[in-house]
């Protein structure tokens, strides 16, 4: 844990056992006698990119694959929303969803949420276990970037849903209650619900393992056993998180900082770091804690990426930025239909969308700077270009403006 510039720092940690929902450990603060506030169950902070796996699961349920490509560019326009990537970094014109996950690319994830539907992503988060009444729980374009502020234990419980291959169980703090004479008054009886199919959960697990292996969560590699996870760092650095799990245990670590007035303040400078990211202190604390928590348990592996439907692609860690997006058909027995992408440049957006959807293609709009979505829109450019061969269900991105040059 940091030792420099820590005045006002709050750290919350919670661990949940997948399949049973048992909260087996939590850290709520250094001294309850000094501060009667549990950082694990009462503290809130914006979740940041730890919410991206819910959008990932929603996309996978709607025929998106880890090989589907989205914008990796900084300041991509999605509708009227300008999406800024962390550090103002661009990752390429088009990147696969797998790369967007491991590198936590905001532009790609907002495009994904817009394509599959904001309510769809919102409902996926609720199914995973994020409470519907969490602060800021509203389906908007920024939702997938973690503008919601759940409790630490909520995030640990939601990630436990992926660890248990899609089984969601409400977190529980009491295993049993027994009288002095030995009578059992209460015994935990978990009631798991299949929130996501095993294939969807296994694919999420595959992608989040890549976050640790080659992405923003590399600090957790030191755990030395299969682990999946996601970093979260928010605007103005007012919270930083790492949420991760093995098949046996799901744990979330959150940092927030209170200013002299009790209001959230930037973590900048904490521990001597210019910016405290989820991949820094939170991931290190996660790793150190999990080493101790799991030391006497045999190593378990995740199930692995499913073969065939719904996500048969096994993308590389460094895919081509110009790869044509592909989306698998719903019916595994149905053949993939290849179509030639038509030239819809200079067409009205409504007409272009009708043509593309008529060919079985999906459409994502990128509103260009200065364009007004309430007025007539025209297609300035498109990706992929015309005459490109694309599979049915592939995404075509249209750059749209009000006035053509």
Question: What does each of the following model-derived ranges do?
Answer:
Residues 56-64, 75, 102-106, 114-118, ...:
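Sec-exported extracytoplasmic/periplasmic mature domains
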Residues 38, 42-79:
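Active-site rim segments in enzyme catalytic domains, especially the processed small/beta chain
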Residues 22-25, 35, 53, 57, ...:
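Solvent-exposed, polar/charged alpha-helical surfaces in well-ordered, non-transmembrane soluble domains
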